[in-house]
Amino acid sequence: MQRETVWLVEDEQGIADTLVYMLQQEGFAVEVFERGLPVLDKARKQVPDVMILDVGLPDISGFELCRQLLALHPALPVLFLTARSEEVDRLLGLEIGADDYVAKPFSPREVCARVRTLLRRVKKFSTPSPVIRIGHFELNEPAAQISWFDTPLALTRYEFLLLKTLLKSPGRVWSRQQLMDSVWEDAQDTYDRTVDTHIKTLRAKLRAINPDLSPINTHRGMGYSLRGL
């Protein structure tokens, strides 16, 4: 049975060695990179199952590296590993498309557990279903793709899952907690503003295709819904 692969981008040798040992004990195949640019080169040819990414790299910002990796592989699970713990940094990472965020100092066992959680989330939403049209949207679950006015949207995994959830119940008002429970397997580890951040980026991507329509409604004090289509 082929082992699941983890790419670890971390320039602190001690941290990298500890994580490699723990991840290998958990059965993962691990490849370590001290810099970000070699990761981009390799990602053009292959993709890991999970990426663990330090924000403070010597050759490229971890945030910028994440952007470029997700442009190549939109469904790539990304876990940020960093000394930064301020809310603005967490929100920036989530807005870029990262899935989770662990601040140093951390427990290596916690990192391994979060990697397992990310993989469960991927598998949970990987069951294919027929392509369906909903108003001006087209939902292609096997390809993890949604089109708007016949134009494919470049979505991160959680943007895709959020929009898919709204698409399947047009007109229904979803609270933030309901959306977190539906999309994030471990909703208790998800920040309240995570949903707002992803909705904001979704709206921007929809507006870039058709600035005259705004299909996602905000219901103050209640949550979000998709307009009846």
Curated annotation (Swiss-Prot):
Q: Does the keyword Ribosomal protein apply?
A: no
Out of the domains of life, which is the source? Bacteria
Entry's Pfam families? Response_reg, Trans_reg_C
Give the InterPro entries listed for this entry: CheY-like_superfamily, OmpR/PhoB-type_DNA-bd, Sig_transdc_resp-reg_C-effctor, Sig_transdc_resp-reg_receiver, WalR-like, WH-like_DNA-bd_sf
Q: Pinpoint the Response regulatory domain residues.
A: 5-119
Query: What name has this protein been given in UniProt?
Result: Transcriptional regulatory protein CreB
Modification after translation, per record:
Phosphorylated by CreC.
GO terms for MF? cis-regulatory region sequence-specific DNA binding; identical protein binding; phosphorelay response regulator activity; transcription cis-regulatory region binding
Where the record puts its DNA-binding region(s)? Answer: 129-228
Q: What does this protein do?
A: Member of the two-component regulatory system CreC/CreB involved in catabolic regulation.
Q: Which residues carry this modification: 4-aspartylphosphate?
A: D54
What start-end ranges are recorded for coiled-coil regions in this protein? none
One GO BP annotation here?
regulation of DNA-templated transcription
Q: Which GO terms describe its cellular component?
A: cytosol; protein-DNA complex
Subcellular localization: Cytoplasm
Q: What is the lineage of its organism?
A: Bacteria, Pseudomonadati, Pseudomonadota, Gammaproteobacteria, Enterobacterales
Protein species of origin:
Escherichia coli (strain K12)
User: What are the alphabetically sorted keywords of the record?
Assistant: Cytoplasm, DNA-binding, Phosphoprotein, Transcription, Transcription regulation, Two-component regulatory system
